[in-house]
Regions:
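Anion-binding alpha/beta catalytic cores of soluble intermediary-metabolism enzymes, centered on
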Residues: 2-226, 230-305
Length: 305
């Protein structure tokens, strides 16, 4: 996948996507209506829209005239998620893409079978360097173990490999780059880095500025391998990731790709506050993505297979 082309906003959608299927949960906040509607109008993708029939018809006024779309009625958010997961299970060998509003993420994470863990990744391109940085966190797990953080990094690594062949530099974030018993997240970051597989260069704990600012690394005379050029950022907690995400999105005006996978099936999610560009980028990335090997599998073995 040519991510640089994608972020430079070539014509989207980029293909007709014949034989592809999009299964999307639609609700009142209309978070993902724009990209779903655009792909339905401009490609030959088939779609299953899950939710209240009345709400779907109000958001897609000509839905009854579209032959490539079916509506699956649901009675609640949880019911919608369960039906989406059933589609992911039965259509896993086909070109299937899933989509949900951000408001359904916590329900999705809670509804996943025990053998899966949940990893959401946001991909940003930094304006000065024009390179991609992946941001991930443990979401509902507010006290992630080092093993959990290492597993998040591995899942993010598999997404990174969709558009890059290089060995990614992974930073386990904390308040500073020195491990201390007084700051628990520094110890977790250190242990997570030690557990990480050899297919990435991992360091932790690492402060945010050392992870992304070469100038800060020079000023602080940091001697590590990651000197402002991290490819993957693993946040210690959900609050940290959320603060970074909204700072980049709202104050730096960046347009994130929001992606996860249910087994091998890509899922993009949208927030009502996301820009139309962000929503299109997320949809195109998901539709054109195909990972090798299971993603999100709850495997605590952190050695290279």
């Amino acid at each position: 996948m040519n991510l640089s082309r994608l972020f430079k906003l070539g014509p989207l959608p980029s293909k007709n996507y014949v034989d592809y299927n999009l299964s999307a949960i639609i609700c009142e906040d209309a978070a993902n209506v724009f990209p779903v509607d655009k792909y339905l109008r401009e490609t030959k993708i088939s779609a299953e829209l899950i939710g209240s029939r009345d709400i779907i018809k109000s958001l897609f006024p000509d839905i009854e005239n579209r032959k490539n779309v079916k509506i699956t009625e649901s009675i609640s958010q949880k019911d919608s998620i369960l039906k989406l997961l059933e589609t992911a299970k039965t259509q896993s060998d086909k070109h299937t893409v899933l989509s949900i509003p951000t408001s359904h993420l916590s329900i999705l994470a809670a509804a996943l079978p025990e053998e899966y863990s949940f990893t959401s990744v946001s991909i940003f391109t930094l304006p000065e360097s024009e390179r991609a940085v992946l941001l991930t966190d443990a979401f509902l797990d507010y006290q992630p173990t080092p093993a959990t953080l290492a597993k998040l990094a591995e899942n993010a690594h598999r997404i990174f490999k969709l558009f890059s062949d290089k060995k990614p530099k992974t930073a386990f974030l904390s308040a500073n780059e020195k491990a201390s018993e007084k700051v628990a997240s520094t110890l977790s970051a250190q242990q997570a880095a030690e557990l990480s597989r050899e297919n990435m260069l991992a360091e932790g704990p690492l402060s945010f500025d050392l992870s992304l600012s070469p100038a800060s690394a020079d000023i602080k005379q940091y001697k590590g391998e990651i000197r402002g050029d991290a490819d993957i950022l693993v946040a210690p907690r959900r609050e940290t990731a959320s603060a970074l995400y909204f700072s980049w999105k709202n104050f730096a005006n960046l347009h994130p790709i929001n992606i996860t996978f249910i087994n091998n099936t890509p899922l993009f999610y949208c927030d009502p506050s996301d820009s139309d560009i962000s929503k299109l980028l997320s949809a195109e990335f998901a539709i054109t993505s195909k990972v090798k090997g299971p993603l999100n599998k709850n495997d605590t073995n952190t050695q290279e297979a």
